């Protein structure tokens, strides 16, 4: 029975009820509505808060009538229209938030796919190997051993393998775990009975594919290695696929039984190299798109990030997240320039910036003006040398944020007032001389991206 039929019959019954005054019925009951919520919950909605109070003495009568009509136990509550609408809006928000959470979770899960992996010279062979084995698990290259430094994309590839196999081979059971997780489980089970240890091994061996990320965490754990060795052999003997990743090649792994090292090399061992600049740049562009950054990020700004974060994909993603946060806080800025980025990443340690130091600034400026670095530090007062010296001081303050005293010391032991005058002079000239401004911008970009 739908709510319209219930409501129609309810009103007829209440109108015929001699205990309900006709004016009460016409003013407050005639306009009520009923809404169903869930399997057996009904809400009686009165027009106004005053109307809700007016029918208070008849609520039990209304409840009984509804139960008699439905002939089943139900839960009945009362409210008024304004409150009901507020609750609907609140429920809708909760539903939307829940939907957003689910969407984000799905998106997070789907991030680790072959389609989302940025391929470049540094990782192409590893990508091809993992994808090939995932398409034919247990057929060739068993085990597949991927190695390389942290942050190069090994975890992404292994999770992509898991997602691909689960999507395309529904009959295959896949187990993915980190080496640390496997070690902790093994240590726990080793405290228990022989029967429970065997059950642990059998449970893992029930899978068709085993993926262990960062297998190096199993090193120097003799008893754990014995369990691992048994599982390893079971998978190989039954043509079930093994994937491993490590920060070192099998030959360089310490703390493993030689039998395991030999078995790691049975299939295919392949390296993921350090990211080349081209691949790092492609990852940055993809991450900017993934994070839906509204501002345009200039190529110079992207090059800056790729130069200083190309050793770690996680750091690249973190740096783009920083851009995203800045963009959200500064929506009026439509373009993220290299000046903005260099200021945003001013906290990068000098060691990380490598050759980005005063020496590099002097070299770039002196090359532009056709003079030696010694001339910039020296006492010569020719116009071109003085201009180059002042620009180099200005850029040192602008890029490295050194103190006036530091800059004076770095430029031939000059007084800090000399540095102030140099900076002010360049700042004044930049406002008037468009060609000089263009030159300084080119020099700055070259220093930051070289």
Curated annotation (Swiss-Prot):
Q: Report the leader peptide range.
A: none
| Annotated PROSITE patterns | DNAA
Which Gene Ontology MF annotations are present?
A: ATP binding; ATP hydrolysis activity; DNA replication origin binding; lipid binding
What are the boundaries of the region Domain IV, binds dsDNA? 328-450
Span-the-membrane segments of this chain are none
Chain residue ranges for the region called Domain I, interacts with DnaA modulators: 1-76
Member of which family? Answer: Belongs to the DnaA family.
Name of the protein described by the UniProt record: Chromosomal replication initiator protein DnaA
- In its UniProt entry, the species of origin is given as Mycoplasma mycoides subsp. mycoides SC (strain CCUG 32753 / NCTC 10114 / PG1)
